[in-house]
């Protein structure tokens, strides 16, 4: 995959984007609108608590999600120079054609029969909102929700909240469809620095801790974050069965490893880390059900 220099691309100052981690600007590249995500500043932050790898996580996880059957944003890695040259993740703006993005938090607030606000991530409340909302077919939306959960489990996403998935609405026809999944920067242990990566590669206890202990889902049951491994083990023959049947057969670790090898800017130990981590997550989450 050829690296891209976005420095001289036309800036589009009329577009702005939400999100807490890192600066974001819009540029025109190859006749499309792209959102450039910059790595967060590490000033006055311990390395292990920064998200210095979030741009890599965003690109790798978004692309892998598409590879294994979840419709997700299209991303590219490149550089942008403004005094310093930084690696950035470019995300194709899927609202550039005029459609309006409504996140699930906004939709949740329209369900007047719900007793909780839009930001609540209690699983039963989220599922109730899926049934009661009137934007898209609830059956289709529930299938997408569980597909996204399975993919997030594989990728180790600890921040799939109600503000980073949702719907695209055509302002003229008022018709809605499910938006591509986006905001994958909290996948694949973005806080891991070089030392942690090497420890995870070389120490099974360090690796297992980052599979069985954390990260957990942002979804909750009775106020407690859902652990991915236990939840999938308990529900593989229940609510998760259709999504597991759709997603898991499409997870080709050899194909994913080839993609990682073809990704620019990564050091050899980073490539090794992502391969080891994904293989271990696959085994812990899915192999026992084969």
What are these language model-derived features?
Residues 59-67, 143-151, 276, 280-283:
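A broad, structural surface signal
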Residues 1-113:
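Conserved ATP-binding subdomain of kinase catalytic cores across diverse folds
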Residues 75-83, 161-171, 290:
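Short alpha-helical "patches" and their helix-cap loops
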Residues 124-193:
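Conserved kinase catalytic-core segment
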Residues 93-149, 258-263, 284:
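ATP-dependent phospho-/nucleotidyl transfer catalytic cores
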Residues 2, 8-12, 124-138, 193-196, ...:
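A short, terminal or domain-edge coil/loop segment
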Residues 16, 53-55, 143-144, 267, ...:
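Aromatic-acidic/polar surface patches that form glycan- and anion
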Residues 66, 170-290:
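C-terminal catalytic region of ATP-dependent kinase domains
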